[in-house]
Amino acid sequence: KSPYYINKADFVACHNPSYIVKNFPMVQDVKPGGIFLINCQWDFEELNKHLHADAKRYIAKNNVQLYTINAIDLAVKVGMGKRTNTILQAAFFALANVLPKDEAVKYMKDAAEHSYMKKGMDVVQKNWDAIDAGAGALVKIDVPADWANATEEAHVEHLEGPEKTVAMVRNIMEPVGRMNGDSLPVSAFVDYADGTFQQGAAAYEKRGVSVTVPEWTSETCAQCNQCAYVCPH
């Protein structure tokens, strides 16, 4: 165990496509020649659109093997609902070469039977189908040569609100939200040395990580406010 994240990995997987859109620094943790797997519903054109230039350059210049898998739709198809974990675990074993693929699939199916047999063979079969789907639905992406020189215009989102709150969001919350908090200098926290943060910052914490979003129907809403209580952002 280590107190720090691994930053020279043979295999890194992004299980939520919103992290690609937000440009989280994930692929940079893959060592040259390693594997990067993205769980998404995109074809190559959409992937090319959503991947940021710095990620493209790193992939191309470091010979990173790029794969995608649509575990989101596969989970629904095999009856697992929104549970993609079993599919993605099978995809990991199919790519990472920790165990021979067939052997890993057998072990996973044995574990699924042991864990879910009390819930019935139907549940076990769904997990077996998820394992087979994850091991066989990988898409290898041929990395274009021009990714090595990919560029894009810098985009700075306009934020409205109290000046001090916007400054805190821009200088601290956004880097931390992009998993770049370790890069912040001590000087960034001078105005917050006593631990006090500006109020109203939750309004800027739009993570956007859900694949599906419920639609509010005013005609049937009972105004219980439980939706806002459960998800204040």
Language model features: what each stretch is:
Residues 1-175:
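Active-site cofactor/cluster-binding pocket
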Residues 12, 35, 213, 228-230:
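Beta-sheet entry/capping signal
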Residues 75, 143, 186, 209-212, ...:
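Broad hydrophobic/π-residue packing in well-ordered secondary structure
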Residues 154-155, 200-223:
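Ferredoxin-like iron-sulfur electron-transfer modules
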Residues 156, 166, 190-192, 200-201:
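Long amphipathic N-terminal alpha/beta scaffold segment
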Residues 178-198:
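Conserved oxyanion/phosphate-binding beta-strand-loop segments in alpha/beta enzyme cores
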Residues 201-202, 226-233:
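Iron-sulfur cluster-binding cysteine motifs and their immediate structural context
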